[in-house]
């Protein structure tokens, strides 16, 4: 039986891979959707949480989106400490288009992964 951590890590990696594939296709909406889903999955894992915000910063830089760039720089500072202390807004999609403090509903398929076996 796979552990919750293994399943969570694999699903996070899949979402990141899908985001990269969307970027290569030039599908910015799908890229962001997969980055947001990766963010939801990454919140309990400090390293992956930070890496997801780095990817979101890259998204903002490629789009020359000043708001996203600034938002991700701020989130990069607080991502790891938030994970370590358990003080992160569960379900938050991580983009600068939403408050960094706002909890959000988690899609059912991601909730199943977060709940584990």
Put a short name on every predicted segment:
Residues 1-36, 40-43, 63-117:
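N-terminal alpha-helical interaction modules that lie
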């Amino acid at each position: 039986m796979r552990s919750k951590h293994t399943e969570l890590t694999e699903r996070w990696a899949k979402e990141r891979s899908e985001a990269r594939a969307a970027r290569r296709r030039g599908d910015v909406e799908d890229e962001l959707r997969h980055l947001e889903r990766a963010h939801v999955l990454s919140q309990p894992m400090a390293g992956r949480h930070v890496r997801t915000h780095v990817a979101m910063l890259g998204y903002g830089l490629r789009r020359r989106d000043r708001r996203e760039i600034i938002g991700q720089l701020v989130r990069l500072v607080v991502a790891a400490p938030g994970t370590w202390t358990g003080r992160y807004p569960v379900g938050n999609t991580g983009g600068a288009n939403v408050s960094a403090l706002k909890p959000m509903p988690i899609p059912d398929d991601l909730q199943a992964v977060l709940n584990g076996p």
